[in-house]
Amino acid sequence: MANASFMAGHLLPFGWDTVVVDIQWYEPAARAGGYNDGAELDLDGYGRQLPATNRFPSAAGGLGFKPLADRIHALGLKFGLHIMRGIPRQAVRDALPVEGTDATAHQVADTSSVCAWNTDNYGLDHSHPGAQAYYDSQLRLFASWGVDFIKADDMLGPYFAGEIAAYRRAIDRSGRDMVLSLSPGRALSLAHLDHLRANADMWRVSDDLWDSWEDIEAQFGRMARWAPHQRPGSWADADMLPVGRIALRAERGNARLTRLTPDEQRTMLSLWCIARSPLMLGCDLPSSPPETLGLLTNRDVLDVLTESRNSRELLRDGHLVLWAAESTTSEDRFVAVFNTGTAGVARTLPLADLGLPGPGSWTAREAWSGAGAGLTRLYGAPALAVDPPAHGVQFYRFSRTRS
């Protein structure tokens, strides 16, 4: 609740509005540093996961996450949870019944379909009608708790089209609107775009991202591929932002402040916003430094996420990468100038190369510094002088000058 209270008090006015309970909330012995193979899980009589009451005391008495969700909603926030694809192996072992059917868990499970990194579940055999019934039952339970957001894991690597479609049907039948986010997205191909749009609200385009420059730099190519296909209700997701104090009770690594430099953090948030990736945090907000709050509340940057269209990479020349987008509320244009190299870059760029139409004049403001831009001329044409630092960004909003 400390994270939720902090978010409501400091970040909600800037659009940060959802708190998600991450992986293995149903395992009493869950730990940092990995997963327990063959763990005993807290399940109900129909093989559905229940919050471990030693970790979530408000779930006692069969209340599930409803008391916690109610508290989150009272703060003006939305409540989400993580869930693994399929049905618990424990339910299969115990031949638990599937609610509302004559089937049991061992009849609807596909025991050949397993997650490579977690032993909690088997996949479902969707040739058996009880498989859909299991997902329907699970989502009815989540809806009764007041869940608004579901991160469904182990869905995309490989691509489990049948599981994804079944989960979508279960949400639609649940009687509650819930956002469906799919993970983990390893080497996700655009060949799946139509199916993703039909069944999910957002989907990861990479494996887990951590606080290393190599992880951030790799997202440039992925988001250049996916950004032109972003649209409301169908979002390619570049993964959580590893800023502030991270890795508390994480699968990998020890608790620490992010290893990303301030410039790298600004680059990351700028790329995510101009590519219109959903923004999710994976940090402990109350113990994060004040500069993290400043990073996450820059309206000039966040506005690009919510009021832009036609996001695209314009140029990749050595370590210089240019992105552009257009405002949905005015004639303004957004331009991000990234430097992925280890030394500073100074260039003068014609405004025409930034996608700014003529005729007419433009003024520009840099979002991170708040300073006016260094507009100049190059070979008689209007131009922008830029000097982004190593691993850094300069992020501009251009407005037409009225005569």
Regions found by a protein language model. Give the residues of each.
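Glycan-recognition surfaces
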Residues: Q107-S113, H126-S127, A133, D177-D284
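Catalytic cores of secreted or luminal carbohydrate-active enzymes
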Residues: T267-L315
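Structural recognition of the beta-strand scaffold that forms the well-ordered cores
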Residues: G15-D22, K78-I83, A143, D148-D153, ...
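Extracytoplasmic, non-cytosolic globular domains
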Residues: Q138-R186
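Solvent-exposed beta-hairpin/edge-strand motifs
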Residues: A352-G370
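Aromatic-lined carbohydrate-binding/catalytic grooves of carbohydrate-active enzymes
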Residues: N3, M7-A143, V147-F149, D154, ...
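Carbohydrate-binding surface patches
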Residues: R266, W272-A275, M280-G282, R316-L356, ...
